[in-house]
Each structure stands twice: as structure tokens, then as C-alpha cells.
Amino acid sequence: MNETVDLIEMKIPAKPEYVGIIRLTLSGVASRMGYVYEEIEDLKIAVSEACTNAVQHAYKGKDGEDGEVAVRFLVYEDRLEIIVADKGGSFDFKQKQEDLGPYTTAHTVDQLAEGGLGLYLMQTLMDEVEVQANSGVTVAMTKFLNRERVDHDTTIQNYETN
């Protein structure tokens, strides 16, 4: 069975001031798909974390290298897949998870290890997260539409009649 997918691709300079463009695009795509407000906010946080990690860490220490962050939105009928990739420095994801250990409700903010919270947020807010660290880092995240799906056209029609 072939699934229909719409692909939206963007590349931004690896600079913090461009992460907002990705957030705005994501918000529009997710809204059009029918995600509810809370889900859109979760998506924006997770994607912002992935982009910010790329901006802050990927090209650190690479003299004069202006890197870029590539973001792909794969729009399916039942889910949104988002891939954030850079070609900068990579890291050992499994080792990083082991070093940081699990976060629990018993931890206070002061007890949290510096770094790694972004990965935790991505894993908490998204349905699926996969990190590949080869030549650069690629973070693939998936969020499924749930039963509270908003019918965008019906919502607009209701608004226009009220």
C-alpha cells in the first residue's frame, strides 16, 4: 500500500535567529493537518529543541564554518514526521543518555544535569524519536494525529457563521 505524503523542505543558517522560521512553518503545517493547540505547542517545543541543539552544538569549534540546518516535514494522513539534520559534529547518543540517566519526578530543577534536557523533552512530547549521529546528527520525530483532530475547514466555517 502506497501512502500519500507531502514533503516540505527548508534549510536555515545554523544561527538562533532563524529557528523561529521553522517554528512558524511547523505551526502552519500542523494547524492545517488538524492538530489541536496543545499538540502544536508540543511539536514546536520538540522541533525547537532539535534545531537549537544543531545551532549550538553542530558547528561549535569549526573555525569559519557557517553551517546549515535542514528540516523536512513529511505530511501523512495520520501523522507528521519531522527530520532535523546538520552536517556538523556528532556525538554518541546512547552514551549521552547513559551519562545523563533518567529524569524522574523525584529530581528537582537544581538536580538536573546540564545538557540533555532537550532530548528528554523531544522524547516526552513526540510519539517517536530516533537520533542518528554519523556525519552530523539527524533527529527524526513523529507525532500521530489523535481522535481530537480538528477539521480545519469545519472550524473556519463555524467561525465565519458566528
Curated annotation (Swiss-Prot):
Belongs to the anti-sigma-factor family. Signal peptide: none annotated. Keywords: ATP-binding, Kinase, Nucleotide-binding, Serine/threonine-protein kinase, Transferase. PANTHER family: ANTI-SIGMA-F FACTOR RSBW-RELATED, SERINE-PROTEIN KINASE RSBW. It catalyses: L-seryl-[protein] + ATP = O-phospho-L-seryl-[protein] + ADP + H(+); L-threonyl-[protein] + ATP = O-phospho-L-threonyl-[protein] + ADP + H(+). SMART domains: HATPase_c. It comes from the Bacteria. Coiled coil: none annotated. Its EC number is 2.7.11.1. GO terms for molecular function: ATP binding; protein serine kinase activity; protein serine/threonine kinase activity; sigma factor antagonist activity. Negative regulator of sigma-B activity. Phosphorylates and inactivates its specific antagonist protein, RsbV. Upon phosphorylation of RsbV, RsbW is released and binds to sigma-B, thereby blocking its ability to form an RNA polymerase holoenzyme (E-sigma-B). Pfam families: HATPase_c_2. This is Serine-protein kinase RsbW. SUPFAM superfamilies: ATPase domain of HSP90 chaperone/DNA topoisomerase II/histidine kinase (SSF55874). InterPro entries: Anti-sigma-factor_SerPK, HATPase_C_sf, RsbW.
